[in-house]
């Protein structure tokens, strides 16, 4: 298993557009801690970045022996905003970004039925460049619940379109995330995200879900007990 460190760890929780650490510094940390890759997001480089900056970012990773495991090419996608699915309407710049970084996996966002056809078209365009598309298990999206996620995967029906398994978001929505769900998702899993939290109605953080309304929780370190039971995962 190859481990990748998301540049999310170097963003402010309340603002995914602001990096707290330079890419060079973060890459050095990843190497020191035994990671094999970085998961790139627009807080470091994205479609808004110049070609020179993207190329330089790729060089910095390569110089440290790090791969780019996945690319999230803009801000609306990780923010899960209404603008998130717009990338599917013009996937070309995102494919260019991934190609320059030597990455074959691109994260996308889907929030309504109309996005399904655009996902098919984008997947077909990505396939021509040997790039895969994936959607994260995420609140307020077509991938909020397990059954609906599988329905959408079958509706898109492209071999290069898959899933980013993420148990914390599934738990926020009241869904199962254990071995049974993993077995159902297994043919479609392209990537795995792991983060930890403890559900708490009075918690410091709150996220809106379609399934359960607002859900309170506390963020905790990945190794801390009392949150997501990662052992069976």
What is each residue range found by the language model?
Residues 12-20, 41-53, 76-87, 110-117, ...:
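Acidic-and-aromatic substrate-binding clefts and catalytic sites of carbohydrate-active enzymes
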Residues 9-11, 37, 71, 121-227:
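Acidic/histidine-rich catalytic cores of soluble enzymes
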Residues 1-103, 127, 131, 158:
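N-terminal pre-domain/capping segments
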Residues 23-30, 51-59, 91-95, 116-123, ...:
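Generic structural signal for well-ordered alpha-helices
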């Amino acid at each position: 298993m190859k481990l990748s460190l998301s540049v999310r760890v170097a963003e402010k929780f309340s603002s995914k557009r602001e990096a707290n650490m330079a890419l060079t510094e973060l890459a050095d940390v990843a190497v020191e801690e035994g990671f094999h890759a970085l998961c790139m997001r627009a807080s470091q480089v994205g479609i808004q970045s110049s070609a020179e900056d993207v190329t330089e970012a790729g060089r910095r990773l390569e110089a440290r022996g790090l791969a780019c495991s996945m690319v999230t090419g803009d801000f609306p996608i990780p923010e899960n905003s209404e603008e998130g699915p717009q990338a599917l309407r013009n996937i070309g710049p995102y494919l260019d970004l991934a190609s320059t970084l030597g990455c074959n996996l691109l994260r996308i966002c889907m929030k309504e039925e109309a996005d399904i056809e655009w996902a098919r078209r984008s997947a077909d365009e990505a396939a021509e460049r040997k790039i895969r598309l994936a959607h994260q298990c995420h609140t307020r999206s077509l991938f909020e619940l397990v059954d609906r996620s599988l329905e959408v995967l079958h509706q898109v029906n492209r071999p290069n379109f898959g899933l980013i398994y993420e148990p914390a978001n599934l738990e926020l929505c009241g869904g199962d995330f254990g071995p049974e769900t993993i077995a159902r998702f297994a043919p479609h899993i392209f990537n795995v995200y792991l983060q930890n939290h403890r559900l708490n109605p009075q918690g410091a953080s709150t996220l809106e879900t379609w399934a359960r309304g607002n859900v309170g929780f506390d963020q905790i370190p990945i190794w801390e007990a009392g949150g997501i039971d990662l052992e069976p995962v």
